[in-house]
Amino acid sequence: ILTNEYLYAPFGDVANREGMILAKYLSGQDVSWRGALRSYASSFYEIRIAQTGLTLDEAKRHGYNADRLEMRAMTKNSDFEDSKPNKVEMIYDKDRKVLLGGTVTGHEAVAQFLDQIAIVINFEIPVEKFIEIDFAYSPTNSSVWNPLLVAYRKLIK
């Protein structure tokens, strides 16, 4: 999607989508698919990691005027004893103010945070529009500052 190059992405969800698209195409339906962002989530014992899109090096190599934004994202209101921090890294295009990639590492909710990043990358939603997204908030289930809203606060001045 971001590089217009073929991408090796041996993931089950990508294979399932490719199968559905092929079936629709073979049945005569008009279908298209722009490709995958290479989104994945994994874990090593209690540590979880999820990544999508381009790394900073990849973005620069493909000609983007890219930079990195790092932040901490709590899994719930930080007043709760069992709230855990996740590290979030977002790669963005400084010229167009759109996200190009993201990585989330931590103990909980990394795939959920990353799915939101993948959506805004896929649809090229500009950072300035993040303030318009109505994120769910509950002190026991999420932080009041979603990572996309933190990106908005840091990048739109």
Positions of predicted regions on the chain:
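A conserved FAD-binding loop/helix module that cradles the flavin
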Residues: 1-55, 141-157
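Flexible, glycine-rich terminal cap/loop adjacent to redox cofactors
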Residues: 46-52, 61-157
